[in-house]
Curated annotation (Swiss-Prot):
Function, as annotated: Catalyzes the condensation of iminoaspartate with dihydroxyacetone phosphate to form quinolinate.
Family: Belongs to the quinolinate synthase family. Type 1 subfamily.
Binding site for iminosuccinate: 47, 68, 139-141, 156, 226-228, 243
Listed GO MF terms: 4 iron, 4 sulfur cluster binding; metal ion binding; quinolinate synthetase A activity
Keywords: 4Fe-4S, Cytoplasm, Iron, Iron-sulfur, Metal-binding, Pyridine nucleotide biosynthesis, Transferase
Recorded catalytic activity of this chain's protein: iminosuccinate + dihydroxyacetone phosphate = quinolinate + phosphate + 2 H2O + H(+)
Higher taxonomy: Bacteria, Pseudomonadati, Pseudomonadota, Gammaproteobacteria, Alteromonadales
Organism encoding this protein: Pseudoalteromonas translucida (strain TAC 125)
Protein name: Quinolinate synthase
Gene Ontology cellular component annotations, sorted alphabetically: cytosol
SUPFAM superfamilies: NadA-like (SSF142754)
UniProt cofactor(s): [4Fe-4S] cluster
Uppermost EC category: transferase
Residues binding [4Fe-4S] cluster: 113, 200, 297
EC number assigned by the record: 2.5.1.72
């Protein structure tokens, strides 16, 4: 395995945490948003990492709470004129790529992703040009321009199977941008892969020694790990998988306690589906370090009720647009993934 040398820019300033709302304020916002969703024939699609009140609102209004793959599928099936995407920028762009005739709006277009930031298209494209014999496989957590440069798009719920398929065909792979997920896939498939050197700031913070200490305190707890985590964290897992796969593991495993190494936004759905089980966030501090994200994506946290209401009242400045030429290339890569995952489901 080899790594390209570009990582997320140093000194990047993360967005401030939003001011929390009181229960009464949440109720008032929710009531107004529900009315606006009806008036605009709009549907709310939320990622598992958004805050609990956002996920609850999506469920209450007939929307969708899901991983990025199912979020992409949902918008194509729904008859709404407007899709409100509560997540990060690449999710809104993916929705627009797949449903160009619908209005796609986000609570804020500033909600980005460290993997996207750390994979600028010019540098990534130049890296790909150095290896013209390789198939370019990129994680969904990337811009439309990077997707257009790729041969395949994958999410964490299908990446292993798609790379395994390509390896069986004898293809050599360029993988980007998450080095930890790439390392996990390479280890499990044996595929010939060269990696871009990106990482998720949330998963990259999990601490190995602190997790071992937590396991010692809760020896009966199962450890659930997202493969965006460092290799040393993955090695301590009882189950490794995407958000939807980790939720399923929490449901099916016999443990009554779980230590979870992914964004703590996932606890809403885990606790909803497993009310008799207890969940602990894997440690992101310790070993002489304090946490920056503390197991919650700062950009996911930008998707507040106030921002959703504002986007519905006036989408100007919050609507997602993609370059139509880039869309064509990105759509081909996305459709390869969607077609492949459709065969997986059979």
């Amino acid at each position: 395995m080899s790594l390209a040398q570009t990582i997320m820019p140093e000194g990047y300033i993360f967005p401030p945490k939003p001011v929390p709302l009181t229960q009464n304020e949440q109720g008032e916002y929710k009531a107004r948003i529900k009315q606006l969703l009806q008036e605009k024939n709009a549907v709310l699609v939320a990622h598992y990492y958004t805050d609990p009140e956002i996920q609850a609102l999506a469920e209450e209004t007939g929307g969708c709470v899901a991983d990025s793959l199912e979020m992409a599928r949902f918008g194509t099936r729904h008859d709404a004129d407007m899709i409100i995407v509560a997540g990060v920028r690449f999710m809104g762009e993916t929705a627009k790529i797949l449903t160009p005739n619908k209005t796609v709006v986000m609570p804020t277009l500033e909600a980005t992703c460290s993997l996207d930031i750390g994979c600028p298209v010019d540098e990534f494209s130049a890296f790909c040009d150095q290896h013209p014999d390789r198939t370019v496989v990129v994680y969904a957590n990337t811009s439309t321009a990077v997707k257009a440069r790729a041969d395949w798009i994958v999410t964490s719920s299908c990446a292993l199977e798609i790379v395994e398929h390509l390896d069986e065909l004898g293809e050599k792979i360029i993988w980007g941008p998450d080095k930890h997920l790439g390392s996990y896939i390479q280890k499990n498939t044996g595929a010939d892969m060269i990696m871009w050197n990106g990482a998720c700031i949330v998963h990259d913070e999990f601490k190995t020694k602190a997790l071992k200490d937590m396991k010692a305190l809760h020896p009966d707890a199962g450890v659930l790990v997202h493969p965006e985590s460092p290799e040393e964290i993955v090695a301590l897992a009882d189950a490794v998988g995407s958000t939807s796969q980790l939720i399923k593991a929490a449901q099916t495993m016999s443990n009554k306690k779980f230590i979870v190494a992914t964004d703590r936004g996932i606890f809403y759905k885990m606790q909803q589906l497993c009310p008799d089980k207890e969940f602990f966030a894997a440690p992101t501090a310790g070993e002489g370090a304090s946490c920056k994200t503390c197991a919650h994506c700062p950009w996911m946290a930008m998707n507040g009720l106030k921002a959703i209401e504002e986007a519905l009242i006036d989408p100007k400045g919050k609507e997602v647009f993609v370059d139509m030429d880039l869309r064509e290339g990105a759509l081909k890569s996305l459709n390869r993934m969607l077609d492949f995952t459709a065969t997986m489901a059979k």
